[in-house]
């Protein structure tokens, strides 16, 4: 009975959060060391340029690691591990956030997430 109640409660929570804000990432792939890749994060339900937006990543078996942030004013900051190799940007007309990743290393292997 407890399981059934928990499940109904979870459904109720999820139903209340339906697609007000959505972030859809794309652009991942398998790349050789030294290669480049650009990640995209298309936003809906809010304006990317009016918020600060971040990229974070999670390497296999590890916790979340902050990668980069872009503020509404356009200022950008990077983790030391990616500085000089990664570039965060946004296209206000497409309401999309980007992460250009160059000179990729084995240690950059991770699942990447955009976040508001």
Curated annotation (Swiss-Prot):
Q: Which residues are in the Ig-like domain?
A: 20-116
> Annotated region Complementarity-determining-2: where?
70-76
Q: Name one GO molecular function term.
A: antigen binding
Annotated region (Framework-2), positions in chain? 53-69
UniProt region (Framework-3), positions on chain:
77-114
| SMART domains recorded | IGv (SM00406)
Identify the domain of life: Eukaryota
Stretches the record annotates as Framework-1:
20-44
The ranges of region (Complementarity-determining-3) come to 115-116
What InterPro entries does this protein map onto?
Ig-like_dom, Ig-like_dom_sf, Ig-like_fold, Ig_V-set, IgHV
- Signal sequence interval, chain numbering: 1-19
SUPFAM superfamilies attached here?
Immunoglobulin (SSF48726)
General function of this protein:
V region of the variable domain of immunoglobulin heavy chains that participates in the antigen recognition. Immunoglobulins, also known as antibodies, are membrane-bound or secreted glycoproteins produced by B lymphocytes. In the recognition phase of humoral immunity, the membrane-bound immunoglobulins serve as receptors which, upon binding of a specific antigen, trigger the clonal expansion and differentiation of B lymphocytes into immunoglobulins-secreting plasma cells.
Query: What is the protein name for this chain?
Result: Immunoglobulin heavy variable 3-66
What is the species of this protein? Homo sapiens
